[in-house]
Amino acid sequence: MRSEVVLAEVTREDVARIADWLEDPEVSEMWFGRYTYGEPAHLGYEPRKMIDANEVEWDEVFHDPHHEPHRSILSVRTASGEHIGEAQLAIDEALGDAQLSILIGRKELWHRGYGTATVISCLDHIFRNLGLFRAWVDVPEYNTSARDMFEHLGFIHEGTLRQSRPHDGARHNSVILGMLANEYTRLSDSISQGTHSV
Protein backbone atom coordinates (compact mmCIF):
# COMPACT_ATOMS: atom_id res chain seq x y z
CA MET A 1 0.00 0.00 0.00
CA ARG A 2 1.31 3.43 -0.94
CA SER A 3 1.93 5.97 1.83
CA GLU A 4 -0.33 8.98 1.52
CA VAL A 5 0.47 12.57 2.39
CA VAL A 6 -1.32 15.89 2.41
CA LEU A 7 0.44 19.18 1.65
CA ALA A 8 -0.90 21.81 4.05
CA GLU A 9 -0.37 25.37 5.22
CA VAL A 10 2.51 25.77 7.67
CA THR A 11 1.69 26.49 11.32
CA ARG A 12 3.94 27.85 14.06
CA GLU A 13 3.87 24.44 15.72
CA ASP A 14 5.14 22.94 12.46
CA VAL A 15 8.02 25.42 12.36
CA ALA A 16 8.96 24.54 15.95
CA ARG A 17 9.07 20.84 15.00
CA ILE A 18 11.21 21.64 11.93
CA ALA A 19 13.65 23.52 14.19
CA ASP A 20 13.80 20.56 16.58
CA TRP A 21 14.26 18.01 13.78
CA LEU A 22 17.11 20.05 12.29
CA GLU A 23 19.02 19.87 15.58
CA ASP A 24 19.60 16.20 14.74
CA PRO A 25 22.77 16.16 12.57
CA GLU A 26 21.51 13.21 10.52
CA VAL A 27 18.33 15.09 9.59
CA SER A 28 20.05 18.40 8.86
CA GLU A 29 22.67 16.71 6.66
CA MET A 30 19.95 15.19 4.49
CA TRP A 31 18.20 18.59 4.21
CA PHE A 32 20.64 21.43 3.46
CA GLY A 33 23.48 20.56 5.83
CA ARG A 34 24.97 23.10 8.21
CA TYR A 35 26.28 26.59 7.72
CA THR A 36 30.02 27.05 8.22
CA TYR A 37 29.29 28.49 11.68
CA GLY A 38 27.55 25.24 12.67
CA GLU A 39 23.83 26.06 12.62
CA PRO A 40 21.50 23.87 10.55
CA ALA A 41 20.95 25.37 7.10
CA HIS A 42 17.40 26.06 5.96
CA LEU A 43 16.16 27.87 2.87
CA GLY A 44 13.45 30.50 2.90
CA TYR A 45 13.45 31.21 6.63
CA GLU A 46 15.21 30.49 9.91
CA PRO A 47 12.92 28.14 11.86
CA ARG A 48 13.94 29.27 15.38
CA LYS A 49 13.38 32.94 14.48
CA MET A 50 10.04 32.29 12.77
CA ILE A 51 8.51 30.68 15.85
CA ASP A 52 8.09 34.13 17.42
CA ALA A 53 7.78 36.17 14.21
CA ASN A 54 5.09 38.83 14.09
CA GLU A 55 2.26 38.54 11.56
CA VAL A 56 3.97 40.75 8.94
CA GLU A 57 7.20 38.72 9.11
CA TRP A 58 5.23 35.47 8.98
CA ASP A 59 3.26 36.59 5.92
CA GLU A 60 6.43 37.72 4.11
CA VAL A 61 7.78 34.17 4.37
CA PHE A 62 4.69 32.02 3.96
CA HIS A 63 2.21 34.17 2.00
CA ASP A 64 4.20 36.62 -0.18
CA PRO A 65 3.34 35.91 -3.84
CA HIS A 66 5.64 38.71 -5.06
CA HIS A 67 8.90 37.27 -3.73
CA GLU A 68 11.16 36.17 -6.60
CA PRO A 69 11.63 33.37 -7.03
CA HIS A 70 8.28 32.63 -5.48
CA ARG A 71 8.80 30.11 -2.69
CA SER A 72 5.87 27.94 -1.73
CA ILE A 73 6.51 26.35 1.67
CA LEU A 74 4.16 23.58 2.74
CA SER A 75 3.88 21.20 5.66
CA VAL A 76 3.82 17.51 4.89
CA ARG A 77 1.19 15.59 6.86
CA THR A 78 0.13 11.97 6.92
CA ALA A 79 -3.39 11.14 5.77
CA SER A 80 -4.38 11.24 9.47
CA GLY A 81 -3.01 14.81 9.81
CA GLU A 82 0.27 14.15 11.64
CA HIS A 83 3.02 16.64 10.71
CA ILE A 84 6.05 14.73 9.40
CA GLY A 85 8.00 17.17 7.24
CA GLU A 86 8.24 20.11 4.88
CA ALA A 87 8.13 20.63 1.12
CA GLN A 88 9.40 23.74 -0.63
CA LEU A 89 8.94 24.80 -4.22
CA ALA A 90 11.09 27.62 -5.60
CA ILE A 91 8.95 28.64 -8.56
CA ASP A 92 10.38 30.58 -11.50
CA GLU A 93 7.36 31.41 -13.64
CA ALA A 94 9.45 33.14 -16.31
CA LEU A 95 11.40 29.92 -16.90
CA GLY A 96 8.41 27.69 -16.26
CA ASP A 97 10.13 25.59 -13.66
CA ALA A 98 10.20 24.78 -9.97
CA GLN A 99 12.92 23.42 -7.72
CA LEU A 100 11.69 20.90 -5.14
CA SER A 101 13.12 20.47 -1.66
CA ILE A 102 11.63 17.74 0.51
CA LEU A 103 12.31 16.95 4.17
CA ILE A 104 10.77 14.10 6.12
CA GLY A 105 11.87 15.14 9.61
CA ARG A 106 10.62 12.05 11.42
CA LYS A 107 13.53 9.63 10.90
CA GLU A 108 11.46 6.60 11.91
CA LEU A 109 9.37 7.29 8.79
CA TRP A 110 12.33 7.36 6.40
CA HIS A 111 12.25 4.67 3.69
CA ARG A 112 8.52 4.09 4.18
CA GLY A 113 7.27 5.88 1.06
CA TYR A 114 6.47 9.29 2.56
CA GLY A 115 9.22 11.07 0.62
CA THR A 116 8.03 9.46 -2.61
CA ALA A 117 4.41 10.38 -1.87
CA THR A 118 5.47 13.96 -1.12
CA VAL A 119 7.39 14.23 -4.40
CA ILE A 120 4.40 12.90 -6.35
CA SER A 121 2.08 15.40 -4.61
CA CYS A 122 4.49 18.24 -5.42
CA LEU A 123 4.77 17.12 -9.04
CA ASP A 124 0.97 17.05 -9.31
CA HIS A 125 0.91 20.64 -8.07
CA ILE A 126 3.78 21.78 -10.32
CA PHE A 127 2.47 20.27 -13.54
CA ARG A 128 -1.31 20.10 -13.10
CA ASN A 129 -2.10 23.13 -10.95
CA LEU A 130 0.70 25.52 -11.92
CA GLY A 131 1.12 24.32 -15.51
CA LEU A 132 4.92 24.53 -15.36
CA PHE A 133 7.25 22.85 -17.86
CA ARG A 134 10.01 21.43 -15.64
CA ALA A 135 10.66 20.30 -12.07
CA TRP A 136 14.14 19.79 -10.69
CA VAL A 137 16.09 18.91 -7.56
CA ASP A 138 19.63 19.46 -6.28
CA VAL A 139 20.71 16.35 -4.33
CA PRO A 140 24.05 16.00 -2.52
CA GLU A 141 25.93 12.94 -3.77
CA TYR A 142 26.09 11.45 -0.28
CA ASN A 143 22.27 11.31 -0.07
CA THR A 144 22.06 8.19 -2.22
CA SER A 145 18.58 7.26 -0.96
CA ALA A 146 17.15 10.56 -2.23
CA ARG A 147 18.90 10.24 -5.58
CA ASP A 148 17.66 6.66 -5.99
CA MET A 149 14.09 7.76 -5.16
CA PHE A 150 14.10 10.61 -7.69
CA GLU A 151 15.63 8.44 -10.42
CA HIS A 152 13.10 5.66 -9.68
CA LEU A 153 10.34 8.22 -10.28
CA GLY A 154 11.88 9.14 -13.64
CA PHE A 155 14.00 12.20 -12.88
CA ILE A 156 16.94 12.48 -15.30
CA HIS A 157 20.50 13.46 -14.39
CA GLU A 158 21.03 16.91 -15.91
CA GLY A 159 24.35 17.91 -14.42
CA THR A 160 26.74 17.90 -11.50
CA LEU A 161 27.70 20.81 -9.27
CA ARG A 162 31.27 20.16 -8.26
CA GLN A 163 32.13 20.32 -4.56
CA SER A 164 29.02 22.37 -3.84
CA ARG A 165 28.16 20.79 -0.47
CA PRO A 166 30.21 20.82 2.72
CA HIS A 167 29.76 17.56 4.66
CA ASP A 168 31.85 15.87 7.36
CA GLY A 169 34.77 18.26 6.89
CA ALA A 170 34.99 17.80 3.11
CA ARG A 171 33.39 19.18 -0.04
CA HIS A 172 31.03 16.97 -2.06
CA ASN A 173 29.36 17.17 -5.44
CA SER A 174 25.63 17.48 -5.84
CA VAL A 175 23.58 16.31 -8.78
CA ILE A 176 20.84 18.15 -10.62
CA LEU A 177 17.97 15.86 -11.58
CA GLY A 178 15.01 17.05 -13.62
CA MET A 179 11.64 16.00 -14.95
CA LEU A 180 9.69 17.58 -17.82
CA ALA A 181 5.92 17.88 -18.00
CA ASN A 182 5.57 15.15 -20.67
CA GLU A 183 7.72 12.80 -18.57
CA TYR A 184 5.45 13.45 -15.61
CA THR A 185 2.39 12.63 -17.70
CA ARG A 186 3.89 9.21 -18.48
CA LEU A 187 4.75 8.68 -14.78
CA SER A 188 1.28 9.71 -13.66
CA ASP A 189 -0.37 7.43 -16.22
CA SER A 190 1.80 4.45 -15.21
CA ILE A 191 1.05 5.01 -11.50
CA SER A 192 -2.70 5.20 -12.11
CA GLN A 193 -2.56 2.06 -14.30
CA GLY A 194 -0.49 0.22 -11.68
CA THR A 195 2.44 -0.37 -14.06
CA HIS A 196 4.91 1.78 -12.05
CA SER A 197 5.71 0.81 -8.50
CA VAL A 198 6.19 3.64 -6.02
Q: Which residues are covered by each model-predicted region?
A:
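Conserved catalytic-core motifs of GNAT/GCN5-like acyltransferases
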Residues: W136-V139, I156-H172
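Active-site acidic-Proline motif in GNAT/NAT acetyltransferases
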Residues: R106-E108, R112, E141-Y142
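Conserved active-site tyrosine of GNAT-family acetyltransferases
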Residues: F150, F155, L177
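Amphipathic alpha-helical recognition patches that constitute DNA-binding helices
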Residues: R17, Q99, A117, R134, ...
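GNAT-family acyltransferases
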Residues: M1-E108, R171-H172, M179-V198
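Short glycine/proline-centered loop/turn elements that form peptide/ligand docking sites
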Residues: V119, N143-A146, Q163-D168
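Conserved GNAT acetyl-CoA-binding A-motif
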Residues: R128-D138
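Conserved acetyl-CoA-binding loop-helix of GNAT-fold acetyltransferases
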Residues: H111-H125, R147-H152
